[in-house]
Curated annotation (Swiss-Prot):
One of its GO terms (biological process) is translational initiation. Component of the eukaryotic translation initiation factor 3 (eIF-3) complex. Pfam families: Paf67 (PF10255). This is Eukaryotic translation initiation factor 3 subunit L. Its main location: cytoplasm.
């Protein structure tokens, strides 16, 4: 079958359509009942023989197996050495390693566990350095600063991407060309193609954990966020991708795009949850599911918008009273913003080893990013109150509004400027995830002419036809 025939074998569905959502759900049902669907990638058979192939398969199986929760420091060191040995063999052998890939799930499990162990080791090392209570472990960590080092992990991920030429293949798919023409000697092998592809998702995650949110989104330039993407075939990868993309958007103050990402995956999960129960990743997905609802609550409070009915109902059920407090704003909402952010944010890590000799100098990365986020919240704390007054007028004197709010006119002027600036957001339309158009993020706009505020409001009508069609489909 030619490349064009393979592409045309799948319907060309709109990214935002209900038909696509149904296709995603049906695809997930098939995955639950039949763990395959990658025959195009599995066409290469294993040429490896004897004990070498068996040993490599054993290493791959071990790499995809989670460490015990209470693993010792020596075990974590040994696990790092095993990963180094495995990836060195795959990347530096004379010619491609020939091995039959059991399934595309396997490659995700390897990359996912590799990054999880890196993340948990970094947090553990930082905790030991800050507490200063275990001198023996501190000494071991001090003597091995490069173990689970940030540079080593990034080097592995970038090397797998480069060796597989996966970005070139994905770019070719976007242009409608055959990716095999750009795959090269290594990228045509399922082993390298799968590891390279999921390494891109891994880079998104690592850069987000390090706090570089724009670079995190940049790594996905060649991946299309739709049902035809390979990550959508693995539920855990699908969920992880949308979580980190949505969170990166939120930290870049692109709340509309963050809500769109969170809503997409949460609707999908709500329609497939009966098929997930009993799966290995069900508990992790359920936890991330709750975290994303918390993040949507934060985004909606900072960027009021209409949500999908499914999301809105679930959000009111989970955070009804808390959501009202967030949307009301004011100093009383600050502790709630911080509580939800801490419970739902990634477990950030530091790119460098901590200072074991000066524990007081080490900062918890989660505290650092929470402080940055809370500074942004404080800047917009009075926006809901200001909006509630401005909605009542078409023109208003600055001093009069300052009197209502019991603040100085110049303080109010600064609030108005911040509010107006925050109402202009970049919104994705097409192209890379970092691209977009600057749009007005809410239905209320105003202009200052000396001390006179001119207010204009645009009310978007509810799309009742879509609402009726969606609910009729659910009933019948």
């Amino acid at each position: 079958m030619s490349y064009e025939e393979r592409v045309n074998a799948h319907p060309n569905l709109g990214d935002e359509s209900d038909v696509e959502e149904e296709a995603l759900v049906n695809d997930y049902r098939e995955q639950v009942n039949f763990d395959d669907g990658m025959s195009e990638l599995d066409r290469t058979t294993s040429l490896g023989t004897g004990s070498q192939t068996q040993d490599l398969q054993a290493q791959l199986a071990a790499a995809a197996t989670p460490l015990e929760y209470q693993a010792t420091l020596e075990t974590k060191f040994a696990s790092y050495d095993n990963y180094c040995s495995l990836f060195h063999y795959i990347l530096n052998s004379e010619g491609p390693v020939e091995l039959e890939v059991p399934s595309y799930y396997w490659a995700w499990d390897v990359i996912d566990e590799f990054i999880y162990q890196f993340e948990s080791f970094c947090r553990y090392r930082n905790r030991v350095a800050r507490s200063g209570s275990n001198e023996e472990e501190a000494q071991l960590l001090r003597e091995n600063p490069n173990t689970w080092g940030c540079y080593s992990v990034l080097n592995v991920l970038y090397s797998l991407i480069q060796k597989s030429q996966i970005n070139e293949q994905l770019a070719a798919i976007k242009r409608g060309e055959d990716p095999l023409a750009f795959a090269g000697e290594y990228g045509s092998r399922p082993l390298y193609k799968m590891l390279g592809y999921f390494s891109i998702i891994g880079l998104l995650r690592v850069h987000c954990l390090l706090g570089d949110f724009s670079l995190a989104l940049k790594t996905l330039d060649d991946i299309e966020m739709n049902k035809k993407a390979m990550f959508a075939r693995v539920m855990a990868a699908h969920f992880t991708t949308y979580y980190y993309v949505g969170f990166s958007y939120m930290m870049m103050r692109r709340y509309g795009d963050a809500i769109r990402m969170f809503s997409h995956i949460l609707v999908y999960v709500s329609r497939t949850k009966n098929f997930q129960k009993g799966g290995n990743s069900y508990d992790a997905i359920a936890k991330k599911n709750d975290q994303m609802y918390a993040l949507i609550a934060i985004c909606v409070a900072l960027h009021p918008t209409r949500l999908d009915d499914t999301i809105h109902s679930a959000l009111r059920e989970k955070y009804g009273e808390q959501l009202l407090r967030l949307q009301h704003g004011g100093p009383d909402a600050l502790p709630l913003f911080e509580e939800l952010f801490r419970s739902a944010c990634p477990k950030f890590i530091s790119p460098t080893p901590p200072d074991f000799d000066n524990p007081a100098l080490n900062i918890d990365p989660v505290d650092h990013h929470t402080a940055i986020f809370m500074d942004e919240v404080k800047n917009t704390l009075y926006n809901p109150t200001i909006r509630s007054y401005l909605k009542l007028y078409t023109t208003m004197d600055l001093k009069k509004l300052a009197g209502f709010l019991e603040v100085q006119p110049e303080v109010l002027r600064s609030w108005l400027l911040v509010n107006k600036q925050r109402s202009r957001q970049v919104r994705w339309v097409e192209g890379g995830l970092l691209e977009g158009e600057v749009v007005s993020a809410n239905d209320l706009d105003y202009a200052l002419e000396n001390d006179l505020i001119h207010v204009s409001e645009t009310k978007a009508g509810r799309r009742l036809v879509d609402w009726y069609l969606r609910n009729l489909a659910r009933v019948y």
